[in-house]
Design a protein with these regions (language model features):
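Metal-dependent amide/peptide-bond hydrolase catalytic core
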Residues: 1-216
Length: 216
């Protein structure tokens, strides 16, 4: 029998989350230009979802200490859930793409070549840096984080990995597919030695919101 993978549901740390959210409110959201909003709404229109544009409001911190198992329907695309059961953990979600469809979708991916992603990553990095400084300079936060981890999160539930020592990553699953398509993908790799940004390499003027008209 081969075990292809497993993942625990994530349980994020209340203390670290509250600390990080305070820094999100301190840093604020990126200042979006008319071009940024125009591209976002054009993509949302194309995907037939509400044309809300890019986020301009910080959502309140939400969370529960106990979530019934039947409500746990989501998880990360990696082992972040397993990590969260071994050490106090949080993840940060900052507006760096366009809310226009399911994750891992072209509608989400296209913003990565635009100022939208650049701004979002910059602001998110500031929040992470401030949170790290808080944890390094305020030891009581670390104590509180571990207190929550030990006496709330793992009080009645202990982590056990589903993976055996002999289980290996299933990297063979896409071997043939990648051998076939990687040469085509390489044509689109960004070359920073020739272009200031990826849009310039692609020859796309920002923000292009409609398909250019073709001459008959």
């Amino acid at each position: 029998m081969k075990l292809l993978g497993s993942a625990w549901p994530a349980h994020m740390n209340k203390t670290v989350a509250e600390t990080m959210h305070a820094n999100i409110e301190k840093v604020g959201l990126p200042t979006w230009t008319e071009a940024d909003q125009a591209l976002a709404k054009a993509v949302q229109r194309e995907m037939k979802v509400p044309e809300t544009g890019l986020s301009t409001k910080i959502n309140p911190l939400r969370g529960r200490e106990v979530i019934p198992d039947e409500e746990k329907r989501g998880g990360g695309s990696d082992d972040i859930g397993d990590i969260s059961w071994n050490v106090p953990t949080v993840t940060i979600g900052y507006p760096a793409n366009i809310q226009a469809g399911p994750g891992h979708n072209w509608a989400n991916a296209i913003s990565m070549a635009t100022p939208i992603a650049h701004k979002g990553v910059q602001y998110g990095a500031k929040v992470v840096a401030l949170t790290v400084i808080d944890l390094l300079t305020r030891p009581e936060l670390v104590t509180q984080a571990w207190d929550y981890f030990n006496n709330v999160q793992t009080k009645n539930r202990k982590y056990v990995s589903f993976l055996r020592p002999e289980d290996k990553p299933a990297i063979w699953l896409n071997k043939e597919r990648m051998e076939k398509y990687r040469p085509e993908m390489k044509k689109y790799y960004y070359d920073p030695s020739k272009y200031k940004n990826y849009l310039e390499q692609l020859g796309i003027k920002y923000p292009t919101t409609e398909k250019p008209a073709t001459k008959n």
